[in-house]
Amino acid sequence: MKKFIFCFLYLYTLNIFAVSKIAHNKLNSCSITRNIFNNYEPKVFETTNNLLRKTGRLSKFYGEMILIRGKILDQNCVPVTDAKVYLWQAGSGGKYPYEPLKTRVDKRRFTNKSDSSFTGSGIVTTNNKGEYYFISMLPYKSSHYLRTANIRIEHPNLTTLETRLELSDQNMCDNDCGEISPILTETKKNIQSYCFDLVLQGTTLKRY
């Protein structure tokens, strides 16, 4: 009986330390965001983070202006600087307003006959805090399609991530965080933001 109690206490002690070790590791690691691929990316991305218009053009769009923003992190939870972030989405009418990269796609999901200035795509580079943001519009929602945007993040030292962002109430956030253009925040204080912190597989040169 004494031998049994001794073995039980010994194994219980090992289990405590094992759990403690796992908990400690979690403080220095983030869950990697899973890939969700989309076939409707544009053949050519607009080189701006404003999806509402082409650079140098006036904006004329039909829908609700929003911000899509967040941070890019590596698996050690370190902010990733100078990551290329690509975003593409459908407009308020449910169609993508550009020529698709892939040819074997449902052509009914695209249009080039709209008088809207909405481009549906954009690119931005993360700052030294790993932050990014896009000016966009709330996409179409129906019984078949959720309100989503598609995003891809590329960095030379990390695994490329492509996933889908769900623009739902649970992902809404305040406008008082991060580095957003003062002109935008002053003139559009009521604009709704959706925040997404995304984690890429791999590590940068430093660890928090």
UniProtKB/Swiss-Prot annotation:
Key words of the record: Dioxygenase, Oxidoreductase
Known EC number: 1.13.11.-
Source domain of life: Bacteria
Class in the EC hierarchy, top level: oxidoreductase
Keyword Oxidoreductase recorded: yes
GO molecular function: ferric iron binding; oxidoreductase activity, acting on single donors with incorporation of molecular oxygen, incorporation of two atoms of oxygen
Cysteines paired by S-S bonds: none
Entry's family note: Belongs to the intradiol ring-cleavage dioxygenase family.
PANTHER family xrefs: DIOXYGENASE, PUTATIVE (AFU_ORTHOLOGUE AFUA_2G02910)-RELATED (PTHR33711), INTRADIOL RING-CLEAVAGE DIOXYGENASES DOMAIN-CONTAINING PROTEIN (PTHR33711:SF10)
Protein name: Putative dioxygenase RT0384
